[in-house]
């Protein structure tokens, strides 16, 4: 059963049904983080290369709690103090996120709330030892501080998760190139242009094979249901998406999504 279908069923029958489905259908193969870490990751951003090629990406703050980041508590919708910069090993999913934002601009224009013009960027980044798998870091946190409730769905999450967290900063030297996507709200034409970064330093590096070890959250530890998309978690994905909308978005990417139950910070989507 595709996870997108399971998500739709979850909306109708509740998360307990979803947990039962994943407990039965979870893969028995090696988890995704057992594979070689990616050499290249991607990030959607609205900032132009004139800024990013010069300054890179810098995290909002120094909160290095992985769960705070993945649930959005330390991101822009929360306290804006995350110590991580979100990226994804899936270029396709990053492209779909950009398409989603572009469609929002088009729909806003139709509703009389904008021009329909849109500019977005997909940055191609060389991963190195400062990039950590979100899924493996999450389960490291559960093993260290929780009661291992999340282990039930470890196989299912590992199959679909592709977020990688850069700690503190991504320097300009790690940013290989950018694809600029422009949608003309008047003509409806969409054009893409690629620019290379003159400051990029070519090296043979990969993301860290080990999880990031978080300090424990100071927030209450309670059982909660958290959406783990295959890209950028809550720091790039929209918090207000319904399960139906997120399932449709994921299906467009040809990927899948999972819901993960774990003992973590209380957070309401």
From Swiss-Prot:
| Gene Ontology molecular function terms on file | NAD+ poly-ADP-ribosyltransferase activity; nucleotidyltransferase activity; toxin activity
Q: Does the keyword ATP-binding apply?
A: no
Which conditions up-regulate this protein?
Activated by the two-component regulatory system BvgS/BvgA.
- UniProt binding sites for NAD(+): 60
Disulfide connectivity?
A: 75-235
Q: Where in the cell is it found?
A: Secreted
UniProt EC number: 2.4.2.-
* One of the GO biological process terms: symbiont-mediated activation of host G protein-coupled receptor signal transduction
> Result of mutating residue 163 to D?
Reduction of several orders of magnitude of enzymatic activity
List, from the UniProt record, the residues annotated as the active site of this protein.
69, 163
**InterPro entries noted in UniProt:** Borpert_toxA
Q: What class of enzyme is it?
A: transferase
Task: Point out the coiled-coil segments of this chain.
Answer: none
Signal sequence interval, chain numbering: 1-34
* Any further remark recorded for this protein: Thiol:disulfide oxidoreductases DsbA and DsbB are required for periplasmic toxin assembly, whereas DbsC is important for extracellular toxin secretion. Experiments with temporal expression of PTX indicate that holotoxin secretion is at a rate of 3 molecules/min/cell. Also, more of toxin chains S1, S2 and S3 are produced than secreted; one half of each chain is incorporated into holotoxin.
Which protein, by its recorded name, is this? Answer: Pertussis toxin subunit 1
Q: Which gene encodes it?
A: ptxA
């Amino acid at each position: 059963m595709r996870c997108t279908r399971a998500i739709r069923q979850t909306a109708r029958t509740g998360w307990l049904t979803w947990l039962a489905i994943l407990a039965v259908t979870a893969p028995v193969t090696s988890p995704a983080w057992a594979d070689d870490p990616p050499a290249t990751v991607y990030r959607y951003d609205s900032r132009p290369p004139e800024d990013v090629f010069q300054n890179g990406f810098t995290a909002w703050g120094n909160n290095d709690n992985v769960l705070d980041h993945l649930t959005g508590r330390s991101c822009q919708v929360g306290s804006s103090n995350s110590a991580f910069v979100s990226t994804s090993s899936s270029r396709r999913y990053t492209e779909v996120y950009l398409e989603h934002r572009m469609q929002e601009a088009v729909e806003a224009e139709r509703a009389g709330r904008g021009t329909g013009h849109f500019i977005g960027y997909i940055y191609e980044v060389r991963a190195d030892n400062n990039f950590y798998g979100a899924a493996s870091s999450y389960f490291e946190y559960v093993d260290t501080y929780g009661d291992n409730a999340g282990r039930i769905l470890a196989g299912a999450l590992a199959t679909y998760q592709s977020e990688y967290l850069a700690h503190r900063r991504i320097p300009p030297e790690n940013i290989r190139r950018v694809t600029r996507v422009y949608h003309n709200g008047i003509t409806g034409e969409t054009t893409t242009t690629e620019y290379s970064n003159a400051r990029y330093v070519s090296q043979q590096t990969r993301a860290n094979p080990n999880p990031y070890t978080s300090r424990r959250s100071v927030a209450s530890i309670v059982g909660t249901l958290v959406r783990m998309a295959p890209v950028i978690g809550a720091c790039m994905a929209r918090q207000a998406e319904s399960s139906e909308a997120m399932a449709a978005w994921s299906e467009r990417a040809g990927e899948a999504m999972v819901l993960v139950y774990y003992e973590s910070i209380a957070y309401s989507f």
